[in-house]
């Protein structure tokens, strides 16, 4: 009986992980390595959002626990996550064990990444606002036919998910690994924008935000500069 439940839990874990997307955030906007790696060597931007931003989004599918929809601090370790923690499974606790082990897997990274100070917002792929074909990828004919037959609205090599309830179709999409799953952040949940030290369109951003009708009129804008005496970033408010 317990062996059967363990197999059920393992199957549920794999199913949950296959349908889970991770949106990564950091506690800091000042890390030099992250500006180099994730912001095109200081030419990009860093956006600060409210920690409850995803709670304001409508829940279209109840495929993951509410716990997976909140910010989760990433833990760092030298050992990978495994399923050895599956013990004393019964019908009453199998769902909790599934979620706990999924969280362990989705919030664990190697010690080498500790400098990122990462927090993760974990959501179902089904709750993506927009799904876009990865650069250089093409959709196989069979999958394209499925898309054409569904109630999906095409948008620039992608489609919106709100018009399709064909879960089997989405299973095919997930397994194809052809798409990026994107989530919109409500404008009122954006607090600050940090422009990289080599970002060259500062005036364009400021002039746009000055318009009282602009959805980001309320957002504070900072220009980052590399400190000349310390290995640090200085953020100077420009709007």
Explain the meaning of each model-derived region.
Residues 1-239:
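Catalytic-core loop-and-flanking beta/alpha module that positions acidic residues
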